[in-house]
Regions:
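Short, intrinsically disordered, mixed-charge
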Residues: 22, 50, 112, 116, ...
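Short amphipathic alpha-helical segments
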Residues: 18, 28, 100-104, 199-201
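Amphipathic alpha-helical transducer elements in NTP-driven molecular machines
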Residues: 41-45, 61, 75, 82-86, ...
Length: 343
C-alpha cells in the first residue's frame, strides 16, 4: 500500500508530506523521490495502549511518496516513482488566489496530465489490437476490445476513469495497464489562514464523488512543531478538536479501502492494516503466513464492546461479547483479535 502526493509546484504538497511524515523531503540528500510513513491517528489505539501498558507500541502507518521535480522532467519523474502507487492525494493551491475558479483550474491542470497519459495508453493498445485482429484475438483481447472504447470515450471528454463507475472486477481486469486516473484520489485544498471556505466552495464545483478536505499548511506546519500539550492549547485557542493533517491521514487510509484490527498484550499493542472485507485467515496472514496456513479460530471482541465492559477481556467474555469465529468471518474495523492456529 502506497499513496503518491501530487501537486503543481508551490502548491504545498511537500509541506504536507513533511507535516504528515515528520520528514524534511526537500533535505533528503537532494533526492527526487522521498518515501515516508504517517501514523494514523486512532483514539481506540491510544486507549488500548493506556489499558495494556505494553513494552512495544505499533500504530497503523500509511506510506506516502513525494516527488520533487519541476519543469520538463517533472512528469517523467512522476511516472517513474509513482507508477506503483495505489492512490493519490492531490494538493491544490487555494491560498494564493481569491477566486475558486482559479483553484479549479489548477486542480484540472494536474488531472489533465493523468487523463492524457491514460488516453495515450488506451489509443496505443487499440491500435495494436487493430493490427493483430486479423490473426485472431485471445479471450483477454476480446474483453479488452469491449471495454477500451468506453474508457477512450470517457478520457476524450476530459474525465478521469475513476468517475466511470467501473465494477471492482472491471478495475481488476485493467490492472496491467497501470492507468493513472483510475486510481482513487483525495483532493486537499491548501487554503490561506482564515479562509477555510475556499475548500467548501471547491467541493461544490467538482464531481460529487470526489473527496475533498481543506487544510492551511502554514498553520499545520506550525502546529506540527509543537509538543503534544502545546498542540492541545493551540487547537483550543482556535476552537479545533484535532489537527487537519490527522483527518487527511485517516481519509487517505480509508480511500484505499483499508481497515485496522488490534492485537493486545503486555508485550505489544499493534494495529494491523488489512483490506476491508478480509476474512479471518487473510487477516491473520498480516501477522504471519503460518497464522493463515494453520488457522483454527479467531477469538474476537469489538473495540466498542471491550470499552463498554470496562476494557477487560474477562468482563467482555462474561457478557458474551467475546466470540470464536471461523474461516468465513469477515474482520471488522476495530476488532480486537487473538488467533488460534496450529502448524
Amino acid at each position: 500500500m502506497e499513496i503518491g502526493i501530487l501537486g503543481l509546484p508551490l502548491s504545498g504538497k511537500s509541506t504536507l508530506f513533511e507535516i504528515m511524515t515528520a520528514l524534511r523531503s526537500r533535505d533528503v540528500h537532494g533526492e527526487v523521490c522521498v518515501r515516508g510513513q504517517a501514523t494514523v491517528p486512532d483514539d481506540r489505539f491510544e486507549h488500548l495502549v493506556k489499558i495494556f501498558q505494553p513494552l512495544k507500541v505499533s500504530p497503523a502507518k500509511v506510506p506516502f511518496v513525494d516527488v520533487n521535480a519541476v519543469g520538463e522532467r517533472a512528469w517523467d519523474a512522476l511516472r517513474q516513482n509513482l507508477s506503483g502507487a495505489d492512490g493519490f492525494v492531490q494538493v491544490v493551491d487555494g491560498f494564493s488566489v481569491d477566486r475558486v475558479e482559479e483553484v479549479i483550474k489548477r486542480y484540472q491542470q494536474m488531472e489533465d496530465e493523468l487523463i492524457i497519459s491514460d488516453l495515450q495508453i488506451v489509443e496505443n493498445r487499440l491500435e495494436r489490437m487493430e493490427k493483430t485482429s486479423k490473426k485472431g484475438l485471445s479471450p483477454q483481447d476480446v474483453a479488452q476490445a469491449q471495454i477500451l472504447p468506453l474508457l477512450k470515450e470517457q478520457l476524450d471528454r476530459g474525465k478521469p476513469l475513476r468517475e466511470l463507475g467501473l465494477t471492482a472486477e472491471e478495475v481488476h481486469s485493467l490492472r496491467s495497464f497501470s492507468f493513472w486516473s483510475i486510481r482513487p484520489e483525495l483532493v486537499v485544498v491548501n487554503t490561506a489562514e482564515g479562509n477555510p471556505g475556499m475548500a467548501d466552495a471547491f467541493k461544490e464545483l467538482v464531481a460529487p464523488q470526489t473527496p475533498v478536505l481543506g487544510i492551511c499548511c502554514l498553520t499545520e506546519a506550525e502546529l506540527a512543531g509543537l509538543s503534544r500539550e502545546e498542540q492541545k492549547e493551540f487547537l483550543a485557542d482556535l476552537g479545533i478538536e484535532e489537527p487537519a493533517f490527522g483527518r487527511i491521514i485517516r481519509a487517505a487510509f480509508s480511500l484505499l479501502g483499508r481497515i485496522a484490527y488490534f492485537t493486545c498484550g503486555a508485550d505489544e499493542v499493534k494495529s494491523w492494516v488489512i483490506p476491508a472485507c478480509s476474512k479471518a485467515p487473510k487477516a491473520a496472514a498480516a501477522i504471519h503466513k503460518d497464522f493463515e496456513r494453520g488457522f483454527i479460530k479467531a477469538e474476537v471482541v469489538s473495540y466498542a464492546d471491550f470499552q463498554l465492559f470496562g476494557s477487560a477481556f474477562a468482563a467482555a467474555k462474561a457478557a458474551g461479547k467475546m466470540r470464536l469465529e471461523g474461516k468465513e468471518y469477515i474482520v471488522q474495523d476495530g476488532d480486537i483479535i487473538t488467533f488460534r492456529f496450529n502448524v
